[in-house]
């Protein structure tokens, strides 16, 4: 563990080492006059009295390779800073959830043909175990409006941190399951949200955000100790069960289900890619709405894809390929999502990549 006192000691040692450099140190060893060099006896090149001692030019030193911090568990990497960072060119920015790039390669389709149905059956069997229906029932200080505000704030936060849609879905699942079993005070509700985001990122992402990043986004209203302690509490309350099926998984499954045929054309692949992109934006809107808390992720995925197909005027409806749900239940969920989209048209267009112009999507269709 690196403490403040240890850091001060290291800084003092570093300063002493720089002062005792090779250009200024004195010879401490005793030598005979015969061992002295002409430079030591002053017999070297004649010195000009008008010219002072020539000093070496100082150049800024940079590391050839940047230090990569690997220990990011529970923010351990926040304790260590790179002593001399090297100038690195900024990485190109990408649109969040930009799925308009080709996402259905031959290897992925073949893997889906081999294992897709087994993965779907397994995740479908886990839905009810991870579904937190009426999670605010025993929350006297947390209302549906507060939950909506928190998740609406987490959406741009997770985009700012370049996290995937899977992380956001898992964050909301962890948040709702914790609210279902533990009363939460209103003044620490935001801390519960960012802690859920940290746990979900560790479960899904290869480079989860740092603790100090999350605390800075909260305007440093909470301490590092509070966040780490709450992280342990959430994990204990959920019994470390974090592998919840998400809307994102079922969106990918149903989309791949459309293009598994050998006769799938490039047009069908393009339409499917656009549909799943719009469906993710619709699903993001639904995550913040407490009215969809009782619907399973697989049902939400089917309904979001149906609304997306309708908005994009596609002729390949997803419902014809899915027969696991009652028609009345699908109609009920689709009706609520249709109302949600019609009331949040501007928000939906802001959530979608820039390729989707407003004119290309018929929200009122």
Swiss-Prot record:
Residue span of region Disordered: 22-64
GO CC annotation, single: microtubule organizing center
Primary localisation category: cytoplasm
Cell division as UniProt keyword: yes
Annotated function: Specifically required for generation of multiciliated cells, possibly by promoting a cell cycle state compatible with centriole amplification and maturation. Acts downstream of mcidas to promote mother centriole amplification and maturation in preparation for apical docking.
An example molecular function term from Gene Ontology annotations: cyclin-dependent protein serine/threonine kinase regulator activity
InterPro entries: Cyclin, Cyclin-like_dom, Cyclin-like_sf, Cyclin_C-dom, Cyclin_N, Cyclins_cyclin-box
Biased composition (Basic residues): 53-64
GO biological process, one term: multi-ciliated epithelial cell differentiation
Keywords from the named record: Cell cycle, Cell division, Cilium biogenesis/degradation, Cyclin, Cytoplasm
Lineage of source species: Eukaryota, Metazoa, Chordata, Craniata, Vertebrata
Family statement: Belongs to the cyclin family.
PANTHER family, A to Z: CYCLINS
Localization per Swiss-Prot or TrEMBL: Cytoplasm
Protein name: Cyclin-O protein B
